[in-house]
């Protein structure tokens, strides 16, 4: 789907959010509005009573055709903290395991008068496909589709960066690891460039970079020490071994020797660098435990921020607009 078509299906005629499928094609103003709304919800999640009534009476269906811990759980928590009713469909025991098509599954759930689908699927474009076929009152959020996009992960990451750094101007960001198979990397590149960082670097072996990667608006590096030099933010990615064969890297041990983040290598970055990882972490393969658990790591803050960001996106999509007053 083209950028224009993707943007058109995501937004109402007045330019407000209806679906959240990809960051590609969305404006800086809209991404900023999502973060500003998430900032309001961040205070709610720290209260004793962590609920607001914005989505009371609404029903959210989590449709995860791929395994997930953080994403599914934070979407569920986000919906419940907005007072929505949540259905988690067990794909292994659902009618899809008996051969029911994706569209038939959606139509049957639609007949139960649900209001939102949160979809994770191994097939790129699955969330777009669903969004094109649902009733006008239903919103679709993409929780990851194939290699294509993971927009809420990218939004919680840029929200974490904004909170740590105060903004995006002048920042140099290095994304390190399996860029080729990563939907997170693509969404983060779109978000970071839209928000105006100074430079986005991608650091990986040649076998784990897409062809013509420069067209995405990034600077490629094949040497980690050089790629980390003077950066403000490091985003580590896991090797997606389930999506690759043996030809991509010689071995996990050799990969760590060349591209694993260690304290020594991190010295090349700026003194106030922050280290991020969307999870799950493979310690000793892409990152050393001393870094993952160290003072520069904001990995657990990313998880916390994921709830507020997903609350923001759900509220904006359900209300067909970002102008919300968050009760506190």
UniProtKB/Swiss-Prot annotation:
Matches recorded under Gene3D superfamilies: Aspartate/ornithine carbamoyltransferase
Tell me which SUPFAM superfamilies the record gives: Aspartate/ornithine carbamoyltransferase (SSF53671)
Q: Name one GO biological process term.
A: amino acid metabolic process
Would you say which domain of life the source belongs to?
Bacteria
Q: Which residues bind carbamoyl phosphate?
A: 70-71, 120, 150, 153, 279-280
Where is the signal peptide, in residue numbers?
A: none
Pathway(s) annotated for this protein in UniProt:
Pyrimidine metabolism; UMP biosynthesis via de novo pathway; (S)-dihydroorotate from bicarbonate: step 2/3
Function per UniProt: Catalyzes the condensation of carbamoyl phosphate and aspartate to form carbamoyl aspartate and inorganic phosphate, the committed step in the de novo pyrimidine nucleotide biosynthesis pathway.
Catalytic reaction equation(s): carbamoyl phosphate + L-aspartate = N-carbamoyl-L-aspartate + phosphate + H(+)
**GO MF annotations, alphabetized:** amino acid binding; aspartate carbamoyltransferase activity
Q: Does the keyword Transmembrane helix apply?
A: no
Q: Per the UniProt entry, what species is this protein from, by scientific name?
A: Methylococcus capsulatus (strain ATCC 33009 / NCIMB 11132 / Bath)
Annotated protein name in UniProt: Aspartate carbamoyltransferase catalytic subunit
In this chain, L-aspartate is annotated as bound at: 98, 183, 238
Q: What is its EC number?
A: 2.1.3.2
């Amino acid at each position: 789907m083209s950028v224009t078509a993707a943007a058109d299906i995501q937004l109402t005629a007045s330019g407000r959010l209806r679906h959240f499928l990809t960051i590609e094609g969305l404006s800086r103003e809209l991404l900023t509005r999502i973060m500003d709304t998430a900032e309001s919800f961040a205070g709610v999640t720290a209260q004793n009573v962590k609920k607001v009534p914005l989505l009371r009476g609404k029903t959210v269906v989590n449709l995860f055709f791929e395994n997930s811990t953080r994403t599914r759980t934070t979407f569920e928590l986000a919906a419940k903290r907005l007072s929505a009713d949540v259905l988690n469909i067990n794909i292994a025991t659902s009618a899809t395991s008996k051969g029911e098509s994706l569209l038939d599954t959606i139509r049957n759930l639609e007949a139960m008068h649900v209001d939102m689908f949160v979809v994770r699927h191994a097939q790129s474009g699955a969330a777009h496909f669903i969004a094109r076929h649902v009733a006008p009152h239903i919103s679709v959020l993409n929780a990851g589709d194939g290699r294509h996009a993971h927009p809420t992960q990218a939004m919680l990451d840029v929200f974490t960066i904004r909170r740590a750094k105060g903004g995006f101007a002048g920042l140099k960001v290095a994304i390190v690891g399996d860029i080729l198979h990563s939907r997170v990397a693509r969404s983060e590149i779109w978000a970071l460039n839209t928000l105006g960082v100074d430079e986005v670097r991608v650091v990986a072996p040649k076998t784990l970079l897409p062809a013509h990667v420069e067209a995405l608006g990034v600077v490629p590096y094949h040497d980690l020490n050089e790629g980390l030099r003077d950066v403000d933010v490091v985003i580590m990615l896991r090797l997606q071994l389930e999506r690759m064969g043996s030809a991509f890297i010689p071995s996990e041990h050799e990969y760590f020797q060349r591209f694993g983040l260690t304290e020594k290598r991190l010295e090349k970055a700026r003194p106030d660098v922050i280290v991020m990882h969307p999870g799950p972490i493979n310690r000793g393969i892409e990152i050393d435990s001393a870094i993952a658990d160290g003072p520069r790591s904001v990995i657990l803050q990313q998880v916390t921020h994921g709830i507020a960001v997903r609350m923001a996106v759900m509220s904006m999509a359900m209300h067909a607009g970002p102008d919300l007053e968050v009760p506190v």
